[in-house]
């Protein structure tokens, strides 16, 4: 024993009696028996989703287990039946859909097996009560976890294991690359490093359960082994079932690593686990046929006494390691379930079941990945052939994202929200895209692509996947009513037109939501074909709002109760939340009309904007903030509520580079008032406060069915933090972001923000924090940067319509480096304070560029028309 260990042992022997006296938990009645401590941080409530955009996913949590499977088109993400395997009640078989273990044997010693997860139940590795039935296997002692979307890094250690195991799991995530970000597959990359003084034989095993046809027993199991094209593995499916069923398809494990062997089609510990205990490697066995039987001339999967049909297959990697040696093994999980059905809401009961999902299936929409792959093995082949490039590009995005000198917790919070793009998205074969409003393991919450929630959450999609965002807006256009009304959300059939709606109607904010998003998407991409395609629907929306939603004919939308995204908030007359959005929509319409030379619309938008700005100041500004509402033409009077989102329209127009909707000093004062009244340290930023109720609005005295005022919506908080950053209120923004970050860490829901259900869409507003830091506005190739920070050296990654880039300030030089894609710059506007020369010069990769400089208040605009592509010629600088 080392000297330090001996000293520690002696100290503990002397000190322990004193500790007993000082600590009542360890003394007296608690001295005997088993004493343990369970920490809140020990809970496993959320994790990173592994899978592709719209392809389904599996959630890996820090205990090494997999949750919330959606790869088989199953409920609640998609329209298939809930994933409930037929089994004895309360048997936690779902713990064993996918698992990894390691068999090891040190020279001259008995073999041991360790399960690379920590279980809460008795079902482990497709066994039950292993302490008795299979005592050679146990879970590892310790798992160290790091999650940085899309990567999950884990280290498994155990005092009985003579090595350490590391795992990196991820699915490719590459901004602006839809194909490779929607792959139905996962990479699991293992490394085992031996610390044993003696040689140790190791067999790493990955096991997957065949879940095809999970909802029916009228099937038989089928498997296919692969040992070609440089990879080995297996694919599992089911025969004898309807090949148009949503659960029909294949799933499997594949590898291009050496020393790979398989055991396909096992069900019971006999003989699989008995062989595993004694064997150094598998024998390339396919025993699938013994999982089936023929009864009455019909072939069916064997059904146990519990009506359970079980079929597992395993992939193994063997090596003999000396001290310091490493076994590297990669496993690729791939799937192909092509029959994704659309569905329409329908409340009819299902007589065959004791529950109803509330919809009826329409037709097969398919998955985007079906444009490229016809089987799970084709998916695996593509992923393995391109694994280096897929890893490099996914890691390149992450490295660039974190190569920024802002607070790490800010970047972590933004990064964590990207998880929702995987958990909650649908991407059909034709490219239709939507994100579910909310999601819990038992049900979806709300429709797809809810337009009011998209106002916040689409800040991420327009930045990272603009083509998907534009396609989502096209669906909303197709759902617009003949008179111009915009519907709240989209059903589970993204191919439907008007009849494919889901959710509430007649909300006043829906048309302004739609106009702002449509035009923002144009400004960010510069796609004039998209603008022309969508323009008639914008005009129809304006006409609808003026003719149907303007009761007092002042050209402003009127509220009459609960009629907006705050769907438990009554507002009356002129409401700041609605008015700021309407003015934002008109400012953007005016700008777009100029581009299209639509003089009639230009005149109308200008008139509304001028009149509405006056009303906003006269009827809603009270000297400190904009009142919640003012029923100045009716009988309700003024509601002095201090809504956090009272000037959300300013947040939107900043992103479009359109300057100020309201007096700059009023914007600043309103933000200060919101922080003063509504921010509570270590709690959060409340949605709304009232001066007469400084602590809590008395919701219990009202007839409102849920408390939206006193509570915090992280999507609102993070978007508001972005607005604070645009206005240079960095300290307040950081308070809010840190509070949100800490709150969700405490809750164990870091990867699963809650509002109306979990994995809520609104918190994807977090991406606007980056835009706010940069003061970034993008308007059809005209880029504005106005970072309100007090740093001589500053760098920050950002993403835009056609690529990604890095913004740098280095003393008296400003530069933009294009990292991926291209950037078409018509003009570049930057603050004068960062430029030391009166006549600064623009350079492209060190060569002067001919420009025209225009002074704009405290900024300088440089006019030039330049396409900058990632690569060797990718840096534009001003000095």
Regions from the language model: what does each represent?
Residues 29-45, 129-133, 139-145, 151-162, ...:
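Gly/Pro-rich turn-and-neighbor structural signature
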Residues 36-81, 292-320, 325, 329-340, ...:
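Substrate-binding groove/exosite segments of carbohydrate-active enzymes
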Residues 67, 75-77, 86, 91-97, ...:
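Non-catalytic C-terminal accessory modules of carbohydrate-active enzymes
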Residues 72, 76-79, 83-155, 467-565, ...:
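Helix-terminus loop motifs that line ligand-binding clefts
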Residues 115-185, 268-315, 415, 419:
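Extended, loop-rich substrate-binding clefts of extracytoplasmic carbohydrate-active enzymes
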Residues 156, 167-169, 204-208, 324-337, ...:
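Short, hydrophobic/aromatic-enriched beta-strand segments in well-ordered soluble domains
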Residues 172-290, 315, 346-392, 836-853, ...:
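Polysaccharide-binding surfaces and accessory modules of carbohydrate-active proteins
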Residues 207, 406-415, 449, 455, ...:
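Catalytic cores of carbohydrate-active enzymes
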């Amino acid at each position: 024993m080392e000297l330090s260990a001996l000293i520690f042992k002696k100290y503990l022997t002397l000190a322990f009696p004193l500790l007993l006296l000082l600590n009542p938990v360890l003394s007296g009645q608690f001295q005997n028996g088993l004493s343990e401590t369970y920490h809140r941080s020990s809970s496993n409530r959320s994790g990173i989703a592994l899978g592709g955009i719209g392809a389904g996913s599996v959630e890996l949590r820090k205990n090494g287990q997999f949750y919330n499977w959606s790869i088989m088109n199953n409920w609640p993400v998609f329209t298939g039946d809930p994933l409930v395997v037929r089994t004895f009640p309360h048997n936690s078989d779902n713990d064993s859909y996918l698992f990894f273990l390691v068999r090891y044997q040190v020279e001259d010693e008995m073999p041991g097996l360790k399960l690379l997860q920590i279980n809460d139940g008795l079902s482990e590795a497709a066994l039950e009560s292993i302490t008795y039935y299979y005592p050679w296997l146990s879970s590892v002692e310790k798992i160290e976890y790091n999650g940085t979307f899309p990567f999950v890094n884990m280290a498994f250690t155990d005092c009985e294991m003579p090595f350490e195991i590391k795992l990196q799991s991820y699915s490719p995530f590459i901004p602006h690359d839809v194909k490779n970000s929607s792959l139905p597959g996962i990479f699991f990359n293992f490394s085992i490093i031996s610390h044993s003084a003696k040689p140790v034989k190791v067999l790493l095993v990955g096991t997957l359960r065949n879940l095809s046809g999970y909802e029916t027993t009228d099937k038989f199991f089928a498997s296919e082994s692969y040992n070609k094209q440089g990879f080995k593995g297996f694919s599992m499916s089911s025969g004898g079932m309807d090949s148009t069923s949503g659960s029909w398809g294949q799933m499997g494990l594949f590898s291009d690593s050496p020393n790979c062997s398989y055991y396909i089609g096992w069900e019971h510990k006999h003989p699989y686990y008995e062989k595993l205990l004694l064997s150094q490697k598998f024998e390339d066995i396919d025993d699938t046929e013994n999982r089936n039987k023929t009864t009455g001339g019909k072939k069916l999967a064997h059904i146990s006494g519990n009506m359970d049909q079980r079929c597992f297959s395993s992939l193994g990697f063997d090596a003999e390691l000396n001290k310091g040696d490493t076994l590297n093994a990669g496993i690729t999980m791939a799937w192909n379930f092509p029959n994704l059905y659309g569905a329409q809401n329908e409340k009819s009961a299902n007589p065959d079941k004791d529950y109803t999902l509330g919809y009826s299936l329409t037709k097969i929409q398919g998955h985007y990945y079906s444009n490229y792959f016809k089987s799970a093995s084709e998916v695996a082949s593509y992923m393995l052939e391109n694994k280096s490039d897929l890893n490099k590009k996914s890691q390149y995005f992450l490295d660039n994202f974190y190569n920024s000198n802002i607070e790490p917790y800010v970047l972590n919070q933004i990064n964590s929200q990207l998880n929702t793009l995987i958990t909650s998205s649908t991407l059909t074969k034709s490219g239709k895209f939507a994100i579910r409003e909310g999601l819990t393991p038992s049900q979806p919450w709300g429709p797809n692509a809810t337009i009011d929630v998209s106002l916040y959450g689409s800040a991420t999609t327009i930045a990272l996947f603009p083509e998907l965002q534009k396609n989502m807006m096209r669906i909303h256009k197709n759902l617009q009513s003949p008179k111009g009304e915009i519907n709240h959300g989209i059903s589970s059939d993204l191919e439907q037109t008007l009849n494919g709606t889901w959710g509430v109607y007649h909300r006043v904010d829906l048309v302004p939501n739609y106009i702002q998003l449509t035009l923002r998407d144009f400004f960010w991409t510069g796609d004039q074909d998209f603008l022309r395609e969508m323009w008639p629907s914008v005009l129809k929306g304006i006409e609808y709002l003026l003719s149907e939603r303007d009761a007092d004919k002042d050209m402003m939308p009127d509220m009459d109760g609960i009629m907006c995204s705050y769907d438990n908030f009554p507002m009356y007359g002129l409401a700041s939340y609605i008015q700021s959005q309407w003015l934002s929509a008109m400012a953007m319409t005016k700008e777009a009309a100029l581009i299209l030379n639509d003089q009639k619309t230009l005149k109308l938008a200008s008139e509304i904007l001028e009149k509405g700005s006056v009303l906003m100041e006269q009827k809603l500004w009270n000297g400190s903030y904009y009142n919640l509402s003012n029923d100045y033409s009716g009988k309700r009077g003024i509601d002095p509520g201090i809504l956090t989102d009272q000037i959300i329209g300013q947040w939107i127009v900043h992103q479009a580079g359109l300057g100020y909707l309201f007096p700059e000093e009023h914007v600043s004062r309103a933000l200060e008032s919101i922080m003063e009244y509504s921010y509570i340290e270590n709690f959060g930023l409340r949605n709304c406060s009232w001066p007469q109720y400084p602590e809590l609005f008395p919701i219990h005295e009202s007839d409102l069915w849920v408390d939206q005022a006193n509570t915090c919506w992280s999507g609102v908080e993070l978007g508001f933090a972005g607005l604070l950053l645009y206005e240079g209120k960095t300290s307040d923004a950081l308070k809010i972001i840190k509070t949100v970050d800490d709150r969700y860490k405490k809750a164990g829901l870091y990867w699963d923000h809650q509002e109306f259900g979990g994995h809520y869409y609104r918190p994807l507003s977090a991406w606007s924090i980056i835009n706010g830091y940069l003061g970034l506005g993008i308007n059809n190739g005209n880029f504005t940067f106005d970072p309100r920070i007090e740093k001589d050296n500053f760098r920050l990654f950002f993403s835009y319509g056609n690529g990604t880039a890095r913004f740098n300030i280095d003393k008296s030089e400003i530069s933009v480096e294009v990292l991926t894609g291209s950037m078409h710059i018509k003009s570049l506007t930057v603050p004068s304070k960062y430029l030391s020369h009166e006549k600064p010069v623009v350079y492209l990769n060190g060569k002067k560029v001919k420009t025209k400089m225009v002074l704009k208040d405290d900024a300088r605009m440089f006019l030039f028309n330049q396409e900058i592509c990632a690569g060797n010629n990718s840096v534009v600088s001003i000095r």
